[in-house]
UniProtKB/Swiss-Prot annotation:
Biological source species: Nitrosococcus oceani (strain ATCC 19707 / BCRC 17464 / JCM 30415 / NCIMB 11848 / C-107)
Entry keyword set: Cell membrane, Membrane, Transmembrane, Transmembrane helix
Protein name: UPF0182 protein Noc_0961
UniProt-listed InterPro entries: UPF0182
Compartment list: Cell membrane
Keyword Membrane tagged: yes
Domain of life: Bacteria
Pfam families for this protein: UPF0182
C-alpha cells in the first residue's frame, strides 16, 4: 500500500473515531452537563457529584472484585495449560489449533485473560451496578432495635442486608459456575493432549478445579442459609397471616438444615474421591440423602398432610406464636403499634347537642366536594383561558382570629388553552412563563357567590381578610410546564389588568444561565430546539427554567423516595409554596402482611413493585413556587431507611425544626398513607388472638353514594376536638364499617397539628350497638317522602341531583350525618349549585337550604317529638 493511501486510511479512521466520540458525547455528555448545571443552580452541585462518585466507586469496587475472581483463576489456569509449545507439534496435527490457543492463554496474561476478565466482570456484575444505592444503604444501615422473633436477627438485616446478599449470591454462583465449566473443559482438553505422551494433568490443576467446586458448594450452602432466612416472607398462610407457620418452621426448616449438612458432606467426599479415589460409596449415600431431603422439602403432599392432619385440627394452638408474630410485625411495619383505642360512648339525650360549641364546629364542615369545588374555581376564578386550577386542596388558616377550614387552589399556567393561532415559540417560552396567584374559599357553606365565602380571589389577588402575598408568581407547580427563558428582552406576561397586560422580569433563584452561545448550543441540542440557539431575546441575566413540574423536579433530585399523589399549596406572606409528602417503603420487612397497592387502587405509585410491607412518611418536601428551591425535612427520624440516606447524603435532609414556622403550621397527615394504614388496620386491629383467628371483627371502607353509583369513601379532613377536649385540631377522619355489613364499627382519626401530629386514634363502638353507616343513612334519606319527592321534581327538569360526599361528624358524643345536595344542569358546564343540606341523627331527616337552618330544624323536630334516647 502506498504512503498516501496509508495516510488517507489513517485520516479516514481518525474522522470515524472522532465522529463516534462526538456522537457518544452528544448522547451522554450533554445530558450529564445539563444535569450538573441544573443541580448546581439549586445549590445541589455537591450532592450531584456525591451521587456520581458513589456510582463510580461502587462500579469500580464491584468490577475489581469480579475482575479478580476471573483474573486470578485464569492466571492460575495459565500455569497448567500449554505444557507443549506449538513449535513442538508437527504442522497439520489435530491438536495444533488447541495448543496455539493454550499457549497464547498461558503467555498472554495482559492481552488475553486481562480484557476477558474485565468484560466478564462487567457483564456478570451489571445487576449489582444498577443496585448501587442499595449497596450504600447496606454499608451504612442503622440498628433498628427490633429483632425478628423467628431467628433473633435485627430487622435492619432484612431491610438492608438480605436483599443485597441474595443479589450477590446469584452473581457469584453464575461466576463460579462459568469458571468451573470453562476451565474444566480446558483442563479436559489439556489432559487428552498430555495423555497422548503418557503424561498426566498436573496436581495443581486438580486442586484448582477442586477449589472451584468447593466454592460452588459453599455458595449453594449460603443459598440454603438465605432460603432459611427467607422463610419470614412466606405467604403460604394468607389470608390468615403472613410469615412462617408450623409447616415452615417444623417441616421445611429442618429439611433446609439437612440439605446444608448433606451438601457439605458431598463437597468433602467429592474432593476426597477426586484426589484419593476413596469415599465413592459415602459420596453416593450423601448425594442420595441430599436429593431425598431436597425432594421432601418441596414435596407438596408432605406439607399438605402436615397442615391437614396436624395443624388444621389444632390450628389456633399450634399457629398461635406465628400469628402473634405476624400481628406484631405488621403493626410495626405500618406504624400502627401505637394506635390509641377509645370507646365512643354516645349520648342518649340528643337535645344536648344544640349549643354554641356545636354551632361553631358546623361552620367548618366541608360541605363542598373537592371535584365540585374544582368546577366552581374554574368557572369563577380562572378568569382567562390560559389559566387553570389543576387541583384544589383542603387546609386551615387563621381568619379573624379563628381556625378556618378552607379550600385553595393555585392559578397555574395552562398554555394548551391558548388559541391555536397564539401558540408560537415566543409565546410558549418567552411570554407566557408562569401562573399567578390563588383562590381561597371557605370549606363550609358560605353566603357569597356559589354559596362560597371567598377569602382570596381575583387577579391580582384580593382579600377582605388581610391576606397579602408578596410574590404570587407560580413558575413551578403541578401542571405540565414547558421550559421557559426568563428574564428576556421580550419581557414576560405577568397578569391581565383591564384591557392591558402587566409585564414582569423574573428575579428568582431558579433556572440555569443561558447567557453564552455555548450554553445556548448545549440546551438547543438537549431540548432538540434550534430556536434556543438562534433567539436574540436573551441577555446576560437570562436563564432557562425547566423541570418545573414539582413531582418531576423532586424525582430528579431524589429518585429513591416514593412520592404522594397530591402535593398541596401553602400561602404565606412571603409567597406560595408546595408541600410534597414523601415516603420510604420496602418489601423486605419480615413477617409483615404485604399490601398490593394496585389491587386496592391506592394512589401512591409503586416504583418497581406493586407490593410493599413497610412504609413511613419520613420526609416532607417544600418547593418554592417562584424560586423552585427544594428543601427536605425529616418528620420521622425513627425510620431506619431515612437514617441511612441521611448518612449517605449528609446535609440533604434537615430536621423538621428547621422548617419555617409559617409553612410548618400547614403540614397535614397525608391521605394516601392514612388510607394504606387503615387498609391494614381494618384487619390487624384484632390483636386478641381468638378474635383475629375467627376474623369476626373485620372492618372495611365505607361506601359513598350518589343517586347513580357508589364508590369507596376516602378520608376527609375535619376540624374537631376529638384528640383533646375543647382543643380544635385539624384531623384526618375515616369511618369504617363491618365487613359484609353496612353498619359503622369505628371512626379512625389522625392528627395534623402539633403536638399531636401523627397521633392515630380509633374510636370504636360497642359490638352490640347498631350505628348507622353511610349506606343505611342513604336508605333513610331515600325513604323520607319529602326528600324523595323533591329529588324527583328536580330531576324532571333540565337539572340533575348530585349528592356530595356524606360527612359523618361526631360532635359532643353524638353522630351527625350531613349530606350536601347539589344541582347541576344536564349536559352543561355551568357552576354546580349547593341547593340543600340534609342533616340526620340516624332517625330524623331534615333538608334545608343551609346547614345552620337544617341544624335548627333538626333541633325543632327532636324537641317536638321529645326524642331522647339512643339514636340508631
Amino acid at each position: 500500500m502506498s504512503r498516501w493511501k496509508r495516510r488517507f486510511l489513517i485520516l479516514g479512521l481518525s474522522i470515524v473515531v472522532l465522529a463516534v466520540f462526538l456522537l457518544i458525547a452528544g448522547f451522554e455528555g450533554i445530558p450529564f452537563l445539563v444535569d450538573l448545571w441544573w443541580f448546581s443552580a439549586q445549590d445541589y452541585g455537591f450532592y450531584f457529584w456525591q451521587r456520581a462518585l458513589y456510582q463510580l466507586v461502587v462500579f469500580i469496587q464491584v468490577s475489581i472484585v469480579f475482575f479478580l475472581i476471573f483474573f486470578v483463576n485464569f492466571w492460575v489456569a495459565s500455569h497448567y495449560l500449554g505444557s507443549e509449545r506449538p513449535a513442538d507439534i508437527p504442522p497439520g496435527a489435530p491438536r495444533k489449533k488447541f495448543k496455539n490457543l493454550f499457549f497464547r492463554f498461558q503467555t498472554g496474561s495482559l492481552w488475553i485473560y486481562t480484557p476477558l476478565s474485565l468484560v466478564l466482570s462487567i457483564i456478570i456484575a451489571w445487576p449489582l451496578f444498577q443496585q448501587w444505592e442499595s449497596f450504600l444503604l447496606y454499608l451504612v444501615a442503622p440498628d433498628m432495635g427490633i429483632q425478628d422473633p423467628a431467628y433473633g436477627k435485627n430487622i435492619s438485616y432484612y431491610l438492608f442486608s438480605f436483599p443485597i446478599y441474595v443479589l450477590i449470591l446469584q452473581r457469584l454462583l453464575i461466576s463460579f459456575l462459568l469458571l468451573l465449566a470453562s476451565l474444566t473443559l480446558f483442563y479436559w482438553i489439556e489432559n487428552r493432549l498430555l495423555s497422548q505422551h503418557g503424561k498426566r494433568l498436573p496436581t495443581g490443576a486438580k486442586w484448582h478445579l477442586s477449589i472451584l467446586v468447593l466454592m460452588v458448594f459453599f455458595i449453594e450452602i449460603w443459598d440454603f442459609f438465605l432460603q432459611r432466612n427467607g422463610l419470614v416472607y412466606s405467604e403460604a398462610h394468607q389470608p390468615l397471616f403472613s410469615g412462617p407457620g408450623f409447616v415452615e418452621m417444623r417441616v421445611i426448616l429442618p429439611f433446609i438444615w439437612l440439605s446444608m449438612f448433606f451438601l457439605l458432606g458431598i463437597a468433602f467426599f467429592l474432593l476426597l474421591f477426586i484426589h484419593k479415589r476413596k469415599g465413592l460409596k459415602t459420596l453416593a449415600v450423601f448425594s442420595l440423602l441430599f436429593i431425598l431431603s431436597l425432594g421432601a422439602r418441596h414435596f407438596h403432599f408432605l406439607h399438605w398432610a402436615t397442615q391437614e392432619y396436624i395443624v388444621k385440627p389444632n390450628e389456633l394452638s399450634i399457629q398461635k406464636p406465628f400469628i402473634e408474630n405476624s400481628i406484631k410485625a405488621t403493626l410495626d411495619a405500618y406504624k400502627l403499634s401505637n394506635v390509641e383505642v377509645r370507646k365512643f360512648e354516645r349520648k342518649k339525650a340528643l337535645k344536648n347537642i344544640f349549643n354554641a360549641k356545636v354551632q361553631d364546629l358546623l361552620h367548618n364542615v366541608p360541605v363542598w366536594d373537592k371535584e365540585l369545588v374544582g368546577q366552581v374555581y374554574r368557572q369563577l376564578q380562572q378568569l382567562r383561558t390560559y389559566y387553570g386550577f389543576p387541583a384544589e386542596n383542603v387546609d386551615r388558616y387563621m381568619i379573624n382570629g379563628k381556625k378556618q377550614q378552607v379550600f385553595l387552589g393555585a392559578r397555574e399556567l395552562n398554555y394548551d388553552k391558548l388559541p391555536s393561532g397564539a401558540q408560537k415559540w415566543v409565546n410558549e417560552h418567552l411570554l407566557y412563563t408562569h401562573g399567578y396567584g390563588l383562590a381561597m374559599s371557605s370549606a363550609g357553606q358560605g353566603q357569597g357567590e356559589a354559596s362560597m365565602d371567598w377569602f382570596i380571589r381575583g387577579i391580582p389577588p384580593e382579600s377582605d381578610e388581610g391576606f397579602n402575598i408578596k410574590q404570587p408568581g407560580i413558575y413551578y407547580g403541578r401542571g405540565s410546564y414547558r421550559y421557559a427563558i426568563a428574564p428576556n428582552e421580550n419581557r414576560e406576561f405577568d397578569y391581565p389588568k383591564g384591557n392591558a397586560n402587566v409585564m414582569t422580569d423574573y428575579q428568582g433563584k431558579g433556572g440555569v444561565s443561558l447567557s453564552s452561545l455555548f450554553e445556548k448550543y448545549i440546551f438547543s441540542v438537549y431540548f432538540q430546539d434550534k430556536d434556543i440557539f438562534f433567539t436574540t431575546q436573551t441577555y446576560d441575566k437570562s436563564k432557562i427554567l425547566f423541570r418545573r413540574n414539582i413531582i418531576e423536579r423532586i424525582e430528579t433530585l431524589t429518585p429513591y423516595l416514593l412520592l404522594d399523589a397530591a402535593p398541596y399549596l401553602v400561602a404565606t406572606t412571603e409567597g406560595l409554596y408546595w408541600i410534597q409528602d414523601a415516603y420510604t417503603a420496602s418489601t423486605w420487612y419480615p413477617n409483615a402482611d404485604v399490601l398490593g397497592l394496585m389491587r386496592f387502587e391506592f394512589p401512591i405509585p409503586p416504583k418497581g413493585s406493586e407490593k410493599i410491607n413497610y412504609i413511613r412518611n419520613s420526609v416532607k418536601i417544600v418547593v418554592d413556587a417562584y424560586h423552585g428551591t427544594v428543601n427536605y425535612y425529616i418528620f420521622d427520624s425513627s425510620d431506619p431507611i431515612i437514617q441511612a440516606y441521611s448518612r449517605i447524603y449528609p446535609g440533604l435532609f434537615k430536621p423538621k425544626e428547621q422548617m419555617p414556622e409559617d409553612i410548618r403550621a400547614h403540614i397535614r397527615y397525608p391521605k394516601d398513607l392514612f388510607e394504606i394504614q387503615m387498609g391494614i388496620y381494618a384487619k390487624y386491629h384484632q390483636t386478641d388472638l381468638e378474635i383475629f383467628y375467627q376474623q369476626e371483627d373485620m372492618w372495611t371502607f365505607a361506601q359513598k353514594y350518589n343517586r347513580e353509583s357508589e364508590t369507596r369513601l376516602r378520608p376527609y379532613y375535619l376540624t374537631l376536638d376529638l384528640i383533646e377536649e375543647n382543643r380544635l385540631d385539624f384531623l384526618l377522619f375515616l369511618p369504617m364499617i363491618v365487613k359484609g355489613q353496612d353498619n359503622m364499627r369505628a371512626m379512625l382519626v389522625a392528627g395534623s397539628d402539633d403536638p399531636y401530629y401523627g397521633k392515630l386514634i380509633a374510636y370504636s363502638f360497642p359490638k352490640g350497638e347498631l350505628v348507622f353507616g353511610p349506606a343505611q343513612i342513604n336508605a333513610v334519606i331515600n325513604e323520607d317522602p319529602k326528600v324523595s319527592a323533591q329529588f324527583t321534581l328536580w330531576n324532571q327538569d333540565d337539572s340533575k341531583v348530585v349528592l356530595g360526599d356524606m360527612i359523618i361528624m361526631p360532635v359532643d358524643q353524638v353522630i351527625l350525618y350531613i349530606q350536601p345536595v347539589f344541582l347541576t344542569i344536564k349536559d352543561d358546564v355551568r357552576i354546580p349549585k349547593l341547593e340543600r343540606i340534609i342533616i340526620s341523627d340516624g332517625r330524623s331527616v331534615v333538608m334545608e337550604p343551609t346547614l345552620m337552618e337544617a341544624y335548627a330544624k333538626l333541633k325543632e323536630r327532636i324537641e317536638t317529638e321529645g326524642a331522647e334516647g339512643e339514636s340508631h
